């Protein structure tokens, strides 16, 4: 039986020198600490001012109640405008109640027009004075348009809802449209002075002043 030295000499005599290395042990999987250290070294080698931070925590999600509260706050946004046109689509037989309520507020400039249409809830039935109307056919409605100052918008909307609501499908809708300016044709007045033709805030303030 040959010794290790004899085997090495025999291999060298054949012109081939063989080195026997022990098998390499498997590397352990990288840990979170190892990965973080590598990222920190990479960030420093790139000359970053701040080391790269690794956050392994799951992303924070808002609870449903907080999300709804944020949506409600965003829904109250109104574009900046001095005047607004309040456009309401109403049942014809509710118009006298709405106009009477607006007159009590001092709103006199109202434009109404007869329109026809149906809502997105096609196929439902609207009842009035014992008769039924299918909402998939055009129904007679009244469009009421009022131009008021910004300070009066909420009061006018609340009054229309109070007088026009029945609680059934088909009560209508209200649209708020910003108005850039108001011009009186007869005199050429603009802005607050011309808004008096709509029974607006300027008209109410001037009528409330005592006559000396």
Curated annotation (Swiss-Prot):
SMART domains: P-II (SM00938). Pfam families: P-II (PF00543). GO terms for cellular component: chloroplast; cytosol. Disulfide bonds: none annotated. It comes from the Eukaryota. Keywords: ATP-binding, Chloroplast, Magnesium, Metal-binding, Nitrogen fixation, Nucleotide-binding, Plastid, Transcription, Transcription regulation, Transit peptide. ATP binds at residues 117-121, 170-173. Belongs to the P(II) protein family. Homodimer. PANTHER family: NITROGEN REGULATORY PROTEIN P-II, NITROGEN REGULATORY PROTEIN P-II HOMOLOG. This is Nitrogen regulatory protein P-II homolog. It comes from Oryza sativa subsp. japonica.
């Amino acid at each position: 039986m040959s010794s290790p030295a004899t085997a090495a000499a025999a291999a060298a005599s054949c012109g081939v020198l063989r080195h026997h290395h022990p098998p390499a042990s498997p590397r352990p999987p990288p840990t979170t600490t190892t990965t973080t250290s590598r990222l920190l070294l990479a960030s420093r080698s790139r000359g970053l001012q701040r080391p790269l931070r690794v956050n392994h925590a799951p992303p924070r999600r808002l609870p449903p109640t907080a999300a709804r509260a944020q949506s409600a706050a965003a829904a109250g946004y109104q574009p900046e405008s001095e005047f607004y046109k309040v456009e309401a689509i109403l049942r014809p037989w509710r118009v006298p109640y709405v106009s009477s309520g607006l007159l009590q507020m001092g709103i006199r400039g109202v434009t109404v027009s007869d329109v026809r249409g149906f809502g997105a809830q096609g196929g439902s039935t609207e009842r009035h004075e014992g008769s039924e109307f299918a909402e998939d056919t055009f129904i007679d409605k009244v469009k009421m348009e009022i131009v008021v100052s910004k300070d009066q918008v909420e009061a006018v909307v609340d009054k229309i809802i109070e007088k026009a609501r029945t609680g059934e499908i088909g009560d209508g809708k209200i649209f708020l449209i910003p108005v850039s300016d108001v011009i009186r044709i007869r005199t050429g007045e603009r802005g607050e002075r011309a808004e008096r033709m709509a029974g607006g805030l300027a008209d109410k303030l001037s009528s409330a002043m005592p006559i000396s």
